């Protein structure tokens, strides 16, 4: 995962003074890799959590292009978890047909559905009703020529102050990227065919790694937690989640509110543990307590993995912990 926002150094920074707290940004999740819609839902959860913590309403519109109701999508279960957990804060609209098509296969129906979705988006942007508007798969709609790019860019650039816009999908137009405050690119990284065992597709779990210099890795993981909880809801059985954080012993991180919102809505499905000091850990300046905390969290992780209690375990900031030895 890469992005165009400027990083502030090595280590973990308490986020209370971070620009990620600011509102009204335009986020773009782009690229060939998976997880773009999942990351957007993580941002939605964070926004709802911040609204709860600050005792203000943070209403969200999830507007999905090119995702008709004829087939299920990976993020459907996460959206169900959001709607059940925060029923008065989420509006959800789907447009388009579900099958894949190319630019030379665009029909009048496709254009009409794209225009219907964009008209809903414009109304939502102008309404002052929403804190966040998610325009899922808007990028490929623009790439297919189904909407006028200049009109979309002008409307988004002139959005009301305080309104956060999240756009997902491959092939983001350069003119849209230029007006964004955060552009994250998801890139697939091959590690061999881990999805198959003895010629059969493996369906019972796996390992997903979110890495890179860009922001949004923890947010993407929260989207995965939502997806896991939603699967448990739809299958009418427990799908317990453990969120275990390294290098985050303090308070004020951007995902804190999202995790708290999850725990309040699904107290029997989400466990959360954190480790480390409330400080940046620099290479060559590690303190004994850093090693103790890292080992403590890893022992908890191993026990959780072996326990059979959890269907999803998020090991947040494990990568830099290992990198710092």
Model-derived segments and their meaning:
Residues 22-126, 206-307:
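Conserved P-loop
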């Amino acid at each position: 995962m890469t992005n165009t926002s400027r990083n502030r150094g090595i280590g973990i920074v308490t986020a209370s003074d971070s620009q990620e707290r600011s509102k009204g940004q335009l986020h773009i999740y782009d690229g060939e890799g998976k997880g773009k819609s999942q990351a957007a839902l993580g941002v939605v959860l964070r926004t709802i959590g911040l609204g709860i913590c600050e005792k203000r309403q943070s209403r969200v519109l999830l507007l999905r292009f090119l995702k008709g109701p004829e087939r299920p999508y990976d993020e459907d279960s996460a959206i169900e978890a959001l709607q059940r957990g925060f029923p008065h804060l989420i509006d959800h609209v789907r447009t388009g047909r579900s099958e894949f098509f190319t630019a030379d296969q665009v029909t009048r129906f496709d254009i009409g559905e794209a225009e219907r979705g964009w008209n809903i988006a414009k109304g939502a942007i102008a309404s002052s009703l929403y804190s966040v508007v998610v325009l899922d798969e808007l990028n490929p709609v623009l790439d297919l020529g189904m909407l006028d790019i200049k009109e979309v860019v002008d409307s988004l650039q002139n959005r009301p102050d305080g309104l956060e816009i999240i756009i997902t999908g491959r092939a983001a137009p350069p003119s849209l990227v230029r007006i964004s405050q955060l552009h994250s690119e998801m890139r697939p990284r091959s590690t061999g065919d881990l999805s198959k065992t003895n010629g059969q597709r493996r369906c019972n779990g796996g390992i997903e790694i979110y890495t890179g210099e860009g922001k949004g890795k923890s947010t993407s993981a929260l989207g995965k937690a939502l997806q896991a909880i939603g699967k448990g809801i739809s299958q009418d059985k427990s799908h317990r989640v453990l969120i275990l954080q390294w290098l985050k012993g303090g308070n004020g991180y951007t995902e804190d509110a999202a995790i708290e919102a999850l725990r309040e809505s699904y107290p029997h499905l989400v466990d959360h543990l954190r480790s480390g000091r409330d400080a940046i850990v620099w290479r060559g300046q590690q303190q004994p307590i850093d090693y103790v905390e890292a080992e403590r969290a890893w022992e908890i992780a191993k026990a959780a993995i072996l326990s059979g209690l959890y269907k999803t375990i998020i090991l947040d900031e494990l990568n830099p912990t290992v990198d710092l030895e």
